[in-house]
Amino acid sequence: MAFWNNRIVLTADFYTSRTSDMLYVYDVSVPPFPYAKLLANLGKMRNHGFEFGFGITPIRQKDMELNINMNWTFERNKLVTLNGDYNGQYLTAPDLKGISYLYGAGYHGASDVCFQMVGQPLGVFYLPHFLGFRENANGGKEYMVSEEKYICGQATPKAMMGSNIAFRYRQWDVTVQMNGAFGHKVYNGTSLAYMNMLSLPNYNVMQGAPEMNIQDQDISDYWLESGDYVNIDYITVGWNIPIKSRYVKNLRVSCSVNNVATITSYSGLTPIINSTVMDSTLGVDDKRTIPVYRSYSVGMNIQF
């Protein structure tokens, strides 16, 4: 829909899908199968979501123009089943299986934190609940956790946002690009490892670790944090230089800053980690994901 001579544009889309015949590796008996592993199309998943777009041009004049565009996506998915019939044989898969885990220097022994669970979204955190600290024989702190695990969040965002703001004044223009993700969690494995005083002397510890004096690395929801963020992807400032030349038609110079800032409550390295790919790093911040770096660039465009 468009209003005000196309200066306000609204778009909305709803989608729902049911995916069947998903590939999965099954453990099977030999015989009747020639191998102990079988790749079969039996899994089912359901997805539905809503996409909303908004664009407005509040200023449109000869020497000045401002355009603001934003889109939001809200998505839900559910793993319905992995079981099914294959050539007369009913194949089953575990209802609960680990997807991602903590790994790397400073953490001794990998352990699953994010799981594939039938009846839930792909990539849920299934962890013991943190009950408090207790003092050990050395005067350090240990985690007290519940015996039972519970679903305490998901690694995939429930909502995603993208925005572009473009402003022009005579020969000058400024463009700002932003994106965000909301409704998901990040497991701060970096803090779990480096807030642990038992990491010394083999590894360094983080600032504040001696004061807290944690001497434990048991996994619980203590280091599970909100992954919500808004990231300013880049800001570009350009100048179309007025030029009178029989050889040069247009001359433009610009400068850009990429990864300007991230607005988030997350206390770890960065919330911008793997939140979509179903592999061992899903939803986990444990140094395997290289943080997005800031860069600066200068450009020149000449048209002859």
Task: Please state what every model-predicted region is.
Residues 1-4, 9, 98-175, 213-227, ...:
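Outer-membrane beta-barrel transmembrane strand signature
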Residues 40-43, 50, 57-155, 258-268:
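Conserved small-residue
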Residues 26-35, 83-93, 191-201, 266-279:
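Flexible, surface-exposed loop regions and adjacent strand-edge segments
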Residues 14-20, 56-58, 72-78, 169-171, ...:
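Transmembrane beta-strands of outer-membrane beta-barrel pores
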Residues 179-260, 265, 272-274, 282:
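Extracytoplasmic gating/loop element in the C-terminal half of outer-membrane beta-barrel translocons
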Residues 51-53, 292-304:
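Outer-membrane beta-barrel "beta-signal"
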Residues 8-10, 66-68, 72, 163, ...:
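Transmembrane beta-strands of outer-membrane beta-barrel proteins
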Residues 1-33, 73:
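Membrane-embedded beta-barrel scaffold of Gram-negative outer-membrane proteins
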